[in-house]
Structure formats: structure tokens, C-alpha cells
Amino acid sequence: MRILLTNDDGVHAGGLAALERIARTLSDDVWIVAPETDQSGLAHSLSLSEPLRLRKISDKHFALRGTPTDCVIMGIRQVMDIKPDLVLSGVNSGSNVADDVTYSGTIAGAIEGTMQGVRSFALSQAYLYEDGARIVPWEVCETHAPALLEKLMVLDLPDGTFLNLNFPNCRPDEVDGAEVTMQGKLAFNLQVDARSDGRGFPYYWLKFGERAGAFIEGTDIHALKHNKISVTPLKLDLTDYSVTDRVARALGYGAQV
């Protein structure tokens, strides 16, 4: 089995190293095309206004000056001579749950793999802060992902569907199994931090504050809160079929879907 790995935290990220170790428990034909620099929050964006610079690090291991989406396209269309059987994107430093999936470059890697006709999974590891330092328990995903992926790889998923896997912030022996979930809802608490540079010119940082959520049973955020691995099937089709009739009636004609 041929596996293509990518991420959004960059080619030198600890999560990518963890993902490679996970992938090598499944296959010895593992390829990496990952961003040269951190591409977090760029979602499913393409580089259309500047060239893509590809750098070979070692055999089957490449860094690309581009987005996660660029990386998957280059991996499948340029770097690899034979299409991969599986695309794994991650392991992200931090969970990708609820509405955050729309921002995530990690999710985008799996989206692009799916669009290219390859079975794709996104993997993310929840973390905590201790004394101001980010502590990411990579051992959780490394312990539990291989067996989980072996089970999920044989699934007959519909076209346009991929899986979003989130691992809880706890010790490996505290993980309480895996749960199939739906997207939860977190309060939108994105803030703008206004600052001034040395010459008095303004600049800004975006940052997330504390985010409350309704930890409803069956959601991804509820699963993580209870030390469960969250497995959420996501799909490319964003159509809201529940309102097509109402929209059609508002326009004065029958539903078309």
C-alpha cells in the first residue's frame, strides 16, 4: 500500500514525524510532501499567484513552498509516479473539531486527497498548556492510530467522503475507546489584537480566546472531553438539502432537488 502524508504545521513539525511513524506501521511505501513553513489556518487554499518551489529532503520526502492543498496536488500529480492508496493529513498540533474544520489546513489535506479520488483521513491531537508551554501528547495518537486506521481503511466510503480523527488530551491508557461523532458547536471567540511597531505603525494578530461549547452527546467536542477518540465522517457536498424546498418556494417554483 502506498501512503502520501502531508500536514499544515510544516515539514519539520513533531506531528508529521508522529504521522510517519504511524504510517510505517501500515506500509513501507510512505511518501511525504509537506509545506516548507507553517500553513495553519489556510484551509483549502491554492497558490495561484506565485510558483511552487519543491525541495527534496530525502528519498520520498519533500518540502513544498505552498499550502497543504498544493502539497497533495503536487504529491499525486507530480512527485509520485503511481497514485497513492491513502492520504493521511496531520497529525495536527491541536484538535480540529466543530466549526474549526472550515479553517483547518489539516482538514484541507484530506479534502484535496478526496477530490483527487484517494481515500483520505485527517488526524489531530488535542493538547493543553502547562506553565505557558504547549504540551502535545503525541504518544496518544501514536499508540491508538495504527489499529484504528487498519479498521477504517477497509471501509467502503461514498465518493466525496473522508474521515476526521481527533485524539483526546490524556494518557494513552486513559483513552476510552473511539466514537463516531458529528460536528459540535463552539462559540466564535476570534479576537483582533492591535499593536504598533517600532515606528508607530499599526499591525494586528488574530487569536482565539476561551471558547465555550455545548458539549452535546454524540459530538466531536463531547467525545474529546470524555477521553474518547472522535471519528467524524465529513463530505465535500456542502448543500443543505433540508432547506432546498423552502428556498424554491421563496423563489416561486418547485424544488429542483
From Swiss-Prot:
Catalytic activity: a ribonucleoside 5'-phosphate + H2O = a ribonucleoside + phosphate
Annotated keywords: Cytoplasm, Hydrolase, Metal-binding, Nucleotide-binding
Subcellular location as annotated: Cytoplasm
Named cofactor requirement(s): a divalent metal cation
Pfam families, per the entry: SurE (PF01975)
GO CC, alphabetical: cytoplasm
Entry's cofactor comment: Binds 1 divalent metal cation per subunit.
Top-level EC class: hydrolase
Superkingdom of source: Bacteria
GO molecular function: 3'-nucleotidase activity; 5'-nucleotidase activity; exopolyphosphatase activity; metal ion binding; nucleotide binding
EC number: 3.1.3.5
Binding residues for a divalent metal cation: D8, D9, S40, N92
SUPFAM superfamilies given in the database record: SurE-like
Function: Nucleotidase that shows phosphatase activity on nucleoside 5'-monophosphates.
PANTHER family tied to this protein: 5'-NUCLEOTIDASE SURE (PTHR30457), 5'_3'-NUCLEOTIDASE SURE (PTHR30457:SF12)
Stored NCBIfam families: PRK00346.1-4 (NF001490), surE (TIGR00087)
HAMAP family assigned: SurE
Protein name in UniProt: 5'-nucleotidase SurE
Native organism: Rhizobium etli (strain ATCC 51251 / DSM 11541 / JCM 21823 / NBRC 15573 / CFN 42)
Gene that encodes the chain: surE
